[in-house]
Amino acid sequence: MISLDYGKYKNARNASWQCILDFNVNKLPVIVTDIIKKSENIRLFKDSDVHMLEEGESGKTILHNGFFEIVYRDTEPSYRCRFTISHELGHIFLGHLLINTPVYRTFAIRDDLESSANVFARDLLAPACVLHELQATTAEQIAKICNISMQAAKHRAERMHVLEARNKYYLHPLERRVREQFDSFIKENKQ
C-alpha cells in the first residue's frame, strides 16, 4: 500500500470534518444517505437498478449533466455499502473527479486518491474525537457504535491507539466544532 503523506491525510481528515459540519451530522452511526439527500448535486444509484459496475467494483462516481452520480453494489452488506458510499463522497468532496471521468472503488486500487477517499470515509463514519469522548477505542466498540465492518473498525482502532497515545485532540477548530455538534449524542452514549 502506498503511504499517504501527512498533507494529503490532513486534507482528507479536514474535508470529513467539514462534511460533518455542513450536513449537520450529530450522531453515530452516520446516515450517509441523509448527506446525499441534503446535497443539491449528488445522486445515489443501486447497481441492481442501473447495472453499471464491473466485476470487482464496489462503487463508482461519475459526473453526468452537472450531477455527481454514485453507483454502489447494493448486494454487499449494509456496512460495506455505507463505507463505499462514504468513500465515493470522499472523491467528490476532495475534488478527485474530472469531467466525465469515473472514479472506481475496487479492492485492488491503492493510489493516493483511493487512500485519501478511504481516510475521508473512515473519518466521516468514525470521527476520532467522538470515539475519544465515548472512550470507544476497541474494534468491537467502534464496529458497534459506527456500524462499520470489523475490518474497518480494526483499522480505526489501530489509528485510535496512535491518537490516544498522542493525546492532541481539539487543536484544529473544525475538530472542536465537530465535538460540539456531537455533544448531545456523546452525553447520551458515554461509556
Can you say where each PLM-predicted feature lies in the sequence?
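Active-site hotspot residues in diverse enzymes, especially metal/ion-binding acidic/histidine motifs
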Residues: 1-191
